[in-house]
């Protein structure tokens, strides 16, 4: 089974629903494969990925398992990484031997912290696959759902990640087109995508837009204009410390724009649906991911650190026990054990309401 896999999606079971509907006229063997991580109940068991394909009724069908240590595809031409998948980094590492300079990876609506790690996931420049950021945009929906599974009106923006680390880039050039030998596999994998619906964006602009959306999302948790203004200023200071700040589009990063984005519209880059705004657990997971990104670039003297510390001392909120006065406690939000404790203790409360 593993030997015939050329194009596949790393994602949850439902990730291929839209793909299946668009390719229902094709023979089953020609439809894309869904690989999802299998939870292990024992550390002694060999990790495996569950293989799903589509039958004639477009219902996910479990057809096989792949043992990730002993069974792997020989070569993967095109790999789409859905933002809903878990264990993303470990899966990419395990499939690293199946990917080379002729392979293409499309990171669909992924967080900044994942593609920042791509250079360490694929350390050899000469064999590093082509890596693209894929950003879905809905045309008619007010909330951007997980596009690969349940959107009918969409547009896919692609931007190529530079082959050299971002801090060494002098300029982020525009990606004018997908390589001809890889574009067809991508469109075929995505089903009914037409060429007119695939745009090629300047990497600098796409990265800047994603960072802007990320900041706007975290600013939303604060209840008053004054707190949101302070949060916006603190995040702009974080951005100025990024080693690749020189290639960003500075027009995205103004306090006015961040505040406007956080108040008037949902974030466009993440797969954020209404459930995130009403589910405290989803909100906390997104906040954790953004802080994980920020903590790489700030120290205890920075405004964001001070702002979060002061805010949580004055706010009657579950976040107050997450953001402690020392940086080591900031890191605790990232640890699995600490997050599990928060889930148990606080997720029955409304963490979106911060009261001064």
From Swiss-Prot:
GO cellular component term, pick one: mitochondrion
Stated name of the protein: Cytochrome b translation regulator cbp7
Location in the cell: Mitochondrion
One record GO biological process: mitochondrial translational initiation
Upper taxonomic lineage: Eukaryota, Fungi, Dikarya, Ascomycota, Taphrinomycotina
Described purpose of this protein according to its UniProt entry: Translation factor for cob1/cytochrome b; plays a role in cob1 mRNA stabilization and required for correct folding of the protein.
Assembly, per entry: Component of a complex, at least composed of cbp7 and cbp8.
Keywords for the protein's UniProt record, in alphabetical order: Mitochondrion, Translation regulation
A GO MF term: translation regulator activity
Phenotypic effect of disruption: Decreases mitochondrial respiratory chain complex III assembly. Decreases RNA level of cytochrome b cob1 and may lead to abnormal folding of cob1 protein. Abolishes growth on the non-fermentable carbon source galactose.
Keyword Cell membrane annotated: no
């Amino acid at each position: 089974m593993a030997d015939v896999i050329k194009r596949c999606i790393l994602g949850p079971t439902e990730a291929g629903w839209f793909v299946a509907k668009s390719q229902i006229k094709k023979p089953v063997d020609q439809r894309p494969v869904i690989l999802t991580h299998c939870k292990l109940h024992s550390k002694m068991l060999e990790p495996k990925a569950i293989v799903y394909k589509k039958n004639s009724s477009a219902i996910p069908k479990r057809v096989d398992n792949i043992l990730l240590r002993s069974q792997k595809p020989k070569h993967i031409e095109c790999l789409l990484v859905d933002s809903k998948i878990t264990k993303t980094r470990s899966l990419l590492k395990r499939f690293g031997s199946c990917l080379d300079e002729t392979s293409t990876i499309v990171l669909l609506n992924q967080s900044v912290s994942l593609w920042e790690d791509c250079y360490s996931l694929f350390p050899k420049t000469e064999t590093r696959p082509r890596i693209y950021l894929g950003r879905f945009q809905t045309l008619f929906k007010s909330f951007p759902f997980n596009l690969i599974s349940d959107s009918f009106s969409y547009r896919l923006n692609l931007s190529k990640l530079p082959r050299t680390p971002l801090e060494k880039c002098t300029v982020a050039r525009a990606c004018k087109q997908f390589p001809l030998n890889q574009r067809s596999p991508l469109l075929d994998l995505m089903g009914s995508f037409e060429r007119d619906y695939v745009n090629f964006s300047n990497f600098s602009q796409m990265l800047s837009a994603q960072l802007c959306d990320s900041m706007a999302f975290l600013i939303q948790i604060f209840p008053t204009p004054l707190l949101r203004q302070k949060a916006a200023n603190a995040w702009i200071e974080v951005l100025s410390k990024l080693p690749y700040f020189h290639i960003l589009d500075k027009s995205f990063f103004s306090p006015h724009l961040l505040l406007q984005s956080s108040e008037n519209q949902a974030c466009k880059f993440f797969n954020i649906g209404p459930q995130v705004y009403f589910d405290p657990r989803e909100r906390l997971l997104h906040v954790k991911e953004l802080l994980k990104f920020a903590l790489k670039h700030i120290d205890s003297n920075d405004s964001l650190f001070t702002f979060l510390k002061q805010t949580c001392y004055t706010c009657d909120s579950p976040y107050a026990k997450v953001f402690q006065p020392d940086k080591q406690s900031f890191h605790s939000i990232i640890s699995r054990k600490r997050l599990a404790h928060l889930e148990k203790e606080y997720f029955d409360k409304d963490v979106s309401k911060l009261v001064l």
